[in-house]
């Protein structure tokens, strides 16, 4: 399965550097010089020549793409990797597509809804769960609230605080 790890942005300077919108949690490893990335739409594989951070933006150059005009042709190209080619040594890490559609249940097995998405954030990741009542609920992806993820069995076990999924007495209805 392909996973988008970045989107090529606008050129930076005249020597083939390009800004990159990062969509991976490990950009320093993913975009290390020598890394080969596939493209969507297909413009052939790109090999990272250099990578550096400038004011919080990742700047890359690719082998064989050496000037501003050539880089401009890559604008909005998605950089993808094939997850099947990668070994995942971390049993405690998931890609959003692995969690989307999983059943969200309590520690006692009571259905709470379905995982819609995984948002990556500064402090912690957040699960977006569509509750059984149709509301979207944001659940911080931390062990006390999400004690177990079982992708093979198709479920995420949650231990939500009172009121997160169930209306509390006296709460106004939306």
From Swiss-Prot:
Residue ranges crossing the lipid bilayer per the database entry: none
Pfam family, one: RimM
Keywords on record: Chaperone, Cytoplasm, Ribosome biogenesis, rRNA processing
Subcellular location: Cytoplasm
GO MF, one example: ribosome binding
Organism domain of life: Bacteria
GO cellular component: cytoplasm; ribosome
GO biological process: ribosomal small subunit biogenesis; rRNA processing
Principal place of residence: cytoplasm
Domain PRC barrel as annotated: residue spans: 91-164
Role summary: An accessory protein needed during the final step in the assembly of 30S ribosomal subunit, possibly for assembly of the head region. Essential for efficient processing of 16S rRNA. May be needed both before and after RbfA during the maturation of 16S rRNA. It has affinity for free ribosomal 30S subunits but not for 70S ribosomes.
Family: Belongs to the RimM family.
Subunit structure: Binds ribosomal protein uS19.
Domain topic, free-text comment: The PRC barrel domain binds ribosomal protein uS19.
Record-given protein name: Ribosome maturation factor RimM
Gene coding for it: rimM
């Amino acid at each position: 399965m392909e996973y988008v790890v970045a989107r090529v942005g606008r050129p930076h300077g005249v020597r083939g550097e390009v800004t990159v919108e990062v969509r991976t949690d490990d950009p320093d490893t993913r975009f290390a010089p020598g890394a080969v990335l596939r493209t969507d739409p297909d413009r052939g594989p790109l090999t990272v020549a250099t990578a550096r951070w400038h004011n919080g933006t990742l700047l890359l150059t690719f082998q064989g793409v050496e000037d501003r005009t050539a880089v401009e042709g890559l604008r909005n190209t998605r950089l993808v990797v094939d997850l099947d080619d990668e070994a995942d040594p971390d049993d405690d890490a998931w890609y959003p597509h692995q969690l989307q559609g999983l059943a969200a249940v309590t520690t006692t097995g009571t259905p709470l809804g379905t995982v819609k998405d995984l948002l990556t954030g500064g402090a912690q990741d957040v699960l977006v769960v569509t509750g059984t009542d149709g509301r979207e609920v944001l659940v911080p992806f931390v062990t006390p609230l999400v004690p177990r993820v079982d992708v093979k069995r198709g479920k995420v076990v949650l231990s939500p605080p009172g009121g997160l999924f169930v209306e509390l007495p006296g709460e106004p209805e939306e």
